[in-house]
Amino acid sequence: MSSGRLLLLLGLLTLWAELTPVSGLGRPKFCELPPEPGLCNARKTFFYYSLHSHACQKFIYGGCGGNANKFKTIDECHRTCVG
């Protein structure tokens, strides 16, 4: 393989690596947890990060318990889990 082709291949591989998103990079592990409504009955609208849709979605939170993948606002969810 000529040095010109090798440089072109190296350049294309570098470009591909820069443009390919790395799933979960810098995302807290708790963003992977499913939504948990908790044990109480307050029925508050909260947001969680969904691994299936790769987006923040609404769920009904009972007001106590649950896990760390719960946010009062969609902006807080985006800042924490989407980036």
Swiss-Prot record:
Tell me the keywords, alphabetical order: Disulfide bond, Protease inhibitor, Secreted, Serine protease inhibitor, Signal
Q: Which GO terms describe its cellular component?
A: extracellular space
Task: Show which residues constitute the signal peptide.
Answer: 1-25
Pfam families in alphabetical order:
Kunitz_BPTI (PF00014)
User: Which molecular function term from Gene Ontology is one that the record holds?
Assistant: serine-type endopeptidase inhibitor activity
Using the chain's own numbering, where are the disulfide bonds?
Answer: C31-C81, C40-C64, C56-C77
Please describe the organ and tissue distribution of this protein's expression: Expressed by the venom gland.
Domain BPTI/Kunitz inhibitor, by residue range, is 31-81
Residues under site feature: Reactive bond for chymotrypsin = N41, A42
Q: Provide the function of this protein.
A: Serine protease inhibitor that inhibits chymotrypsin (Ki=3520 nM).
Which family is annotated? Belongs to the venom Kunitz-type family.
In Swiss-Prot or TrEMBL terms, this protein is called Kunitz-type serine protease inhibitor
